[in-house]
Amino acid sequence: MERARRLAYRGIVKRLVNDTKRHRNAETPHLVPHAPARYVSSLSPFISTPRSVNHTAAFGRHQQTRSISVDAVKPSDTFPRRHNSATPDEQTHMAKFCGFDHIDSLIDATVPKSIRLDSMKFSKFDAGLTESQMIQHMVDLASKNKVFKSFIGMGYYNTHVPTVILRNIMENPAWYTQYTPYQAEISQGRLESLLNFQTVITDLTGLPMSNASLLDEGTAAAEAMAMCNNILKGKKKTFVIASNCHPQTIDVCKTRADGFDLKVVTSDLKDIDYSSGDVCGVLVQYPGTEGEVLDYAEFVKNAHANGVKVVMATDLLALTVLKPPGEFGADIVVGSAQRFGVPMGYGGPHAAFLATSQEYKRMMPGRIIGISVDSSGKQALRMAMQTREQHIRRDKATSNICTAQALLANMAAMYAVYHGPAGLKSIAQRVHGLAGIFSLGLNKLGVAEVQELPFFDTVKIKCSDAHAIADAASKSEINLRVVDSTTITASFDETTTLDDVDKLFKVFASGKPVPFTAESLAPEVQNSIPSSLTRESPYLTHPIFNMYHTEHELLRYIHKLQSKDLSLCHSMIPLGSCTMKLNATTEMMPVTWPSFTDIHPFAPVEQAQGYQEMFENLGDLLCTITGFDSFSLQPNAGAAGEYAGLMVIRAYHMSRGDHHRNVCIIPVSAHGTNPASAAMCGMKIITVGTDAKGNINIEEVRKAAEANKDNLAALMVTYPSTHGVYEEGIDEICNIIHENGGQVYMDGANMNAQVGLTSPGFIGADVCHLNLHKTFCIPHGGGGPGMGPIGVKNHLAPFLPSHPVIPTGGIPQPEKTAPLGAISAAPWGSALILPISYTYIAMMGSGGLTDASKIAILNANYMAKRLEKHYPVLFRGVNGTVAHEFIIDLRGFKNTAGIEPEDVAKRLMDYGFHGPTMSWPVPGTLMIEPTESESKAELDRFCDALISIREEIAQIEKGNADVQNNVLKGAPHPPSLLMADTWKKPYSREYAAFPAPWLRSSKFWPTTGRVDNVYGDRKLVCTLLPEEEQVAAAVSA
């Protein structure tokens, strides 16, 4: 006991001494680095911060009674401090490092005073909800949605999302925070999964080429229509659509046809006539929208005999049991992969597809994954044939599509991997069997006439009063499709049960007893599909689709692929003009709630009041942010938003009788989607240049506008500019366009530097699309999903797109409307991901959003300042600052060291980073955008990597490293290369792998050497190869 007492006494004395020392030193400031957990930069400027004062009463003193402040009892789970990474002290330090007293001084010097807003204030959520308040608000909204059992069909079906895919892909930031796989060496996992997706599509459709996803089935059909026009070089200007196609698909095609000067004719199959000689293509549905399964063999022969290309819209699940379109001779096949394990989500997002023959591969839209080899001859994957795409070919591109639906394509591919060919066929047979039981039961009841044509999953019923039956079904929480006053269809899916069929029998029996059950009818049901239309050809024969059918195996496969890909889980992704910011967990949570996922897009609006309230609130918030008067939420990608906005401008001019206004002025520095979208709208493009400081040449704009004042339709402009500068003359540019009869279209790609500081409407724009997957936190998903809603001024609001099934328009709705047709297949686009942006805005509040813009600008200027001694910063504003992104110039290194931007980007992989945007908007440069979500420590780490690489370049310039055989040209360095038996590099394996100290504790490893792009396009292979062919390809390489 005595020993214990002495030890306790010593402890008390020691604590008293330490307390005294802490109090003595509390007033003395110390220079301490802002210390991240992973790494403290040896080159980072230091922050002066006082040590925290210990307010705990010393031993033996009486505690003082203190009152509790109101702030102390406010909610602690506020969100802006979790999203905006720079602390107030860091903000001040970084601003001073850039030459300003504080962050506001930097912002005042950067954003032109003439366009600066005083403040931004929301009518709702202005102070911002806490995370727990936001979750409760979303729970309340979800409770206002009513999930009825859907038999509507029309291309949207309920599905079982395998929980292993739900948890490990859809809810996994390692999958959903990846960027489009431009940097192939750190993207091999999702490239493999997307190649799996393409293989699923080619196997099931019977055509050899597929892309890696499109936005939805309607836009896929419209892209196919454009292909038919291009294949025949625009010589035939009529496109025929069979009336058995989904109505939303027909409407999207009609809208798109206007820009191509194509005439769309809708006709019953039996009445289609090619005698005019002017038909470029024909679109049919297989199975039809009302369920019929037809033999198209003779139809296709007849079309081809008349020089007409055949497009077939189809259903992947049906193709597991039906003869594939390729065997009929279809030229192009489109459809949606939604029912392969992707929730309906009130319309999206879903991965569509387009398959075609090798002959038309270079006319295909969208990203295509191909097989190539790396520097060691090992098979590697990459995005193939990029020279077709908008970022290279601009107005000559095959399509304006950029972001597609990669995340959803990966989910659908994994669904096929998990079930395999036998499992998919079993699901299809079950669905067909349930439809057959229902058809047989209705015949036995004798209360309605059932369609006699073969069907797969949809039964067409003739009855005396379709609306009365639909109303009766609604009372049992069942949704049927009403085709007309005497026609109903019921579509079955993998979630349908025998009990559901029994409920349908009761609805049609109108209160009369049903003398049988669905289960009792099952033995009597015959296969409705004739043998001539039954699939005989094999599919999904590759081992990948036949070995991962247990959850353990699929889980390991998913994680094997995931481990190959760099995402925001690993490090910042500083891609200029891409805004790879935080996708917060609270924002993502509602996306997988059944009350949001399980609603059909054509369900009665009164069943989706939670969604509708969110749309209204979001529309109001976006109007406040942008300074516009009305919004359309329908465009389901940025490129779709661009197209919609230009078509709204076109409709406005048409309404005034200005049919001749078709000239669109576009700066040479514009995103590639801008000229591609303008071309799709039938506009004549006139380009204007930039001055030496990267600003749009105002005099060139003036001359172009005045020279075309009678025909001027629009100007497309990005603000801040794609050069990373707030142009002083933007308001003058807008005035010039308006004075000459045009409208100003603002590309919203750089909205992250506007929110709360200025706005498109305040600047003078008439319409703008917002990339919700950039500024407003929807994750990029490895190449989609995205959303591109458009905001407009009052005079353009009447022309916002509507929908043929569920009428829509602007939010808020204008008094008078003359809407466009549908831009997307679903009324509100990819509605399921709108909660992400909604929760982000509502939690940040107006102040948090404004701070986010300021910190994004601060971070970019801090990085530019740190790097300017090592790399030239190409463009700056009038006060020497940059916007939220900046460009470093690497062009000189080609002459001094033989080094190009690609070499720097590949070497950055060895440092654990994704490279910035390469050679755009200026060839030979890198464009860097840090976003507000990245900590100062992460910014410093990336700057240190680039500074270290600059020294590696210097070693080449000094002759200390070989021009051809050096650490940059050899990058990246995967483990397979580093562990090889022989090493012939003039630098060490250790330096190749660990060029920076932070890599010792945590390193992301590229899994392949530098991929050979030329080989991949020269020997194009876009599906999984059998193993023996993989070996042969490697040997030949």
Curated annotation (Swiss-Prot):
What residues does the transit peptide encompass? 1-67
Q: How is it modified after translation?
A: Glutathionylated at Cys-98, Cys-777, Cys-943 and Cys-1022 after S-nitrosoglutathione treatment.
Task: Output the Gene Ontology cellular-component terms.
Answer: apoplast; chloroplast; chloroplast envelope; chloroplast stroma; chloroplast thylakoid; cytosol; mitochondrion; plasma membrane
Summarizing activity control, the record says: Inhibited by harpin, S-nitrosoglutathione (GSNO), nitric oxide, N-ethylmaleimide and 5,5'-dithiobis-(2-nitrobenzoic acid).
Q: Where in the cell is it found?
A: Mitochondrion
Query: Which of the residues bear the PTM S-glutathionyl cysteine?
Result: 98, 402, 463, 777, 943, 1022
Q: What GO biological process terms does the UniProt entry carry, in alphabetical order? A: glycine catabolic process; response to cadmium ion
Q: State its Enzyme Commission number(s).
A: 1.4.4.2
Record field: catalytic activity: N(6)-[(R)-lipoyl]-L-lysyl-[glycine-cleavage complex H protein] + glycine + H(+) = N(6)-[(R)-S(8)-aminomethyldihydrolipoyl]-L-lysyl-[glycine-cleavage complex H protein] + CO2
The knockout outcome noted for this protein's gene is: No visible phenotype; due to the redundancy with GLDP2. Gldp1 and gldp2 double mutants have a seedling development arrested at the cotyledon stage even under nonphotorespiratory conditions.
| SUPFAM superfamilies xref list | PLP-dependent transferases
Q: Which InterPro entries match?
A: GcvP, GDC-P_C, GDC-P_N, GDC_P, PyrdxlP-dep_Trfase, PyrdxlP-dep_Trfase_major, PyrdxlP-dep_Trfase_small
Keyword tags: Glutathionylation, Mitochondrion, Oxidoreductase, Pyridoxal phosphate, S-nitrosylation, Transit peptide
Tell me the tissue specificity.
Answer: Expressed in leaves. Detected in roots, stems, flowers and siliques.
Q: Which cofactor does it need?
A: pyridoxal 5'-phosphate
A molecular function annotated in GO for this UniProt entry is: mRNA binding
> List-wise, which residues carry N6-(pyridoxal phosphate)lysine?
774
| Main EC class the enzyme belongs to | oxidoreductase
Report the sequence similarity comment from the record: Belongs to the GcvP family.
Q: Please give the HAMAP family that the UniProt record associates with this protein.
A: GcvP
Could you tell me what this protein does? The glycine decarboxylase (GDC) or glycine cleavage system catalyzes the degradation of glycine. The P protein binds the alpha-amino group of glycine through its pyridoxal phosphate cofactor; CO(2) is released and the remaining methylamine moiety is then transferred to the lipoamide cofactor of the H protein.
Q: How does it assemble?
A: Homodimer. The glycine cleavage system is composed of four proteins: P, T, L and H.
Entry-linked PANTHER family: GLYCINE DEHYDROGENASE (DECARBOXYLATING), MITOCHONDRIAL, GLYCINE DEHYDROGENASE, DECARBOXYLATING
User: Could you tell me what this protein is called?
Assistant: Glycine dehydrogenase (decarboxylating) 1, mitochondrial
GN (gene name): GLDP1
